[in-house]
């Protein structure tokens, strides 16, 4: 059993600490002087937790064993915390049974964590990482449409049409809706952060799938390029943010007393052909494809972060910086030539 943190420090629990977003969030919280508890499924998995063990040098970080399917496993890590960041989500893109592999565990995981929050009297606010996939997938027609926090993905369309990888947007949408329902019924101060596709660099030993997807036009990975096209066709745009800005947004809305509701975190909206043109010009040394035939060259919609910006948040990274860092990260990983 981990001992309590010293009194006087703000304490945060980050659920799912081995992930791309969560591990950087842990790092930023430690750098801000927080005491941090984080949960992982298997603390004995050296490959998965080595980067967290290194972060213990930055400050007061305790690692707990917890599983989204086991409500009681969150009691100890959440006890005494001011903020709880629920970042973990089950992802099985190749699943043949998304209902049981992703949707049910995501919803159950959110409810289990929030139940533990109701029992820990210290928790002031819960911050849930949702996804633009919970906002943008609907049957809106036209171009130049602006979507914001009022919009929700159309679950009936997803579950009836079952487009490729439909389980992920369905799980994120239903998990966020379950969180809002539980928060209202149990008087929890909940905020959701809604990031778009994330890139930059990662503390994890494995390359996150989202950076792989964002980098596909540069690496020439046909399977992932088709994934980007599918994203544009399904959600209406290729929208992107730097993972550090997404983590900064989580901390910003946790600390900002006036914050409430949902917050989209998106730095740039584009399309596959527009992005390819930009990347081809910026990195001529990589043979970025620019001919996409009759594939739509304009995005159908803009995902707006106006609410977050009006609250006082400012983005550190535009699309140039996002890709410069992602390219350097891929070079360091040996996935790109100089």
Curated annotation (Swiss-Prot):
Which UniProt keywords are present, listed alphabetically?
Flavonoid biosynthesis, NADP, Oxidoreductase
Q: Where does NADP(+) bind?
A: 18-21, 48, 87-90, 168
Gene Ontology biological process terms, A to Z: flavonoid biosynthetic process
Alphabetized InterPro entries for the sequence: Epimerase_deHydtase, NAD(P)-bd_dom_sf, NAD(P)_dehydrat-like
Please write the reaction equations for the catalytic activity of this protein.
a (2S,3R)-flavan-3-ol + 2 NADP(+) = an anthocyanidin with a 3-hydroxy group + 2 NADPH + 2 H(+); a (2S,3S)-flavan-3-ol + 2 NADP(+) = an anthocyanidin with a 3-hydroxy group + 2 NADPH + 2 H(+)
One of the record's GO molecular function terms: oxidoreductase activity, acting on the CH-OH group of donors, NAD or NADP as acceptor
**CDD domains of this UniProt entry?**
AR_like_SDR_e
Task: Tell me which domain of life the UniProt entry assigns to the organism this sequence originates from.
Answer: Eukaryota
Q: In which pathway does it act?
A: Secondary metabolite biosynthesis; flavonoid biosynthesis
Entry EC number(s): 1.3.1.112
Family under the similarity heading: Belongs to the NAD(P)-dependent epimerase/dehydratase family. Dihydroflavonol-4-reductase subfamily.
Q: What does this protein do?
A: Produces the terminal flavan-3-ol monomers required for the formation of proanthocyanidins or condensed tannins in leaves and flowers, as well as in the skin and seeds of developing berries. Catalyzes the double reduction of anthocyanidins, producing a mixture of (2S,3S)- and (2S,3R)-flavan-3-ols.
User: What other comment is given for this protein?
Assistant: Hyperbolic binding of NADPH and NADP(+) to the free enzyme, with a single binding site each. The most likely enzymatic mechanism is sequential ordered Bi-Uni-Uni-Bi, with NADPH binding first and NADP(+) released last. This enzyme is strictly pro-S stereospecific and the reaction mechanism involves two hydride transfers from two distinct NADPH molecules.
| Identification of the protein by name | Anthocyanidin reductase ((2S)-flavan-3-ol-forming)
State the organism named in the record.
Answer: Vitis vinifera (Grape)
- Tell me the name of the encoding gene: ANR
